[in-house]
Each structure stands twice: as C-alpha cells, then as structure tokens.
C-alpha cells in the first residue's frame, strides 16, 4: 500500500510539472525593458533562438527607420482569455507605441488556441488597417506556420 501511494505521488508530481504555465498580461516578462533591442517575448521557447533574433533585428530596424514600436508575444496558452483582449491589454500595459502618435503594434501567437492576433494603435490604423492585418495573417503567417517554419 505504501509503495502504491508513493507511485501515486510520483505520478501526480510528474503531471504537475508537465502542466503549462498559463500566461497573463501581468506575469508575462517584458523583454524590451531589459534590452531595448529585443521585441519578441518567447518565454516557453516556442520559437528558435535564431528566429527570435531575426525578428528582433527586423523590428529594431523598423523602429529606427519609422518610429513604430512593435512587440511580438509567442505563448503556449493564455487559458480561457480572448486573444484580442489579451493583445490589446498587453499593448496598454507595456505602453507599446509613442504616447503622442499611438503607433504601436502587438502581434500575439497563442499555440493552444491556434490564434494569431494583431492589434494596432490608432496612429497606425491608417497605414495598417484591420483588413491588411488579416490579409498578412492569412497569406503570410498561417501558411508559414503550417509548414513549421
């Protein structure tokens, strides 16, 4: 009986260690605060370091050339939270975009919900309206992700 109980405890502990952390806007690490050249929050290492570095480099150049502030968050789960609401709240909490021009862009990928969400600040909506964001998702991002690239 004691061995069975020990086996049960071991299995329970193993199951608990495999449980994914549910990310919230409050517990998500803001990598840009620690390093101004980083724009990709990838706490579960879903993206490879090479992919993360490549995106960081592109977004740094974009900000230097245009002033557009962007953050990309790649997460395994946000629990039952809505992707749009999460992305919107993340942009507000992290202050993505200049306050005067409100030119921020948040790109959120949540693997368990199979969700890609792009949220733009009001100052960016004229250049990047929802229709163009959706087209980018459908024509570029989703096929790329389906090919595991």
Language model region names:
Residues 1-24:
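Bacterial Sec-dependent N-terminal signal peptides
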């Amino acid at each position: 009986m004691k061995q069975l109980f020990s086996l049960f405890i071991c299995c329970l502990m193993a199951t608990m260690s495999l449980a994914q952390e549910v990310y919230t806007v409050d517990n998500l690490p803001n990598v840009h605060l620690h390093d101004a050249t980083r724009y990709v929050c990838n706490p579960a290492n879903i993206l490879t370091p090479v992919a993360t570095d490549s995106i960081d480099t592109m977004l740094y150049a974009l900000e230097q050339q245009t002033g557009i502030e962007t953050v990309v968050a790649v997460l395994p789960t946000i629990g039952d939270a809505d992707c749009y609401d999460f992305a919107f709240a993340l942009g507000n909490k992290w202050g993505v975009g200049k306050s005067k021009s409100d030119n921020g862009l948040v790109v959120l990928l949540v693997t368990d919900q199979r969700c890609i969400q792009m949220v733009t600040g009001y100052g960016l909506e004229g250049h990047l309206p929802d229709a163009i964001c959706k087209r980018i998702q459908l024509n570029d991002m989703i096929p790329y992700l389906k090919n595991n690239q």
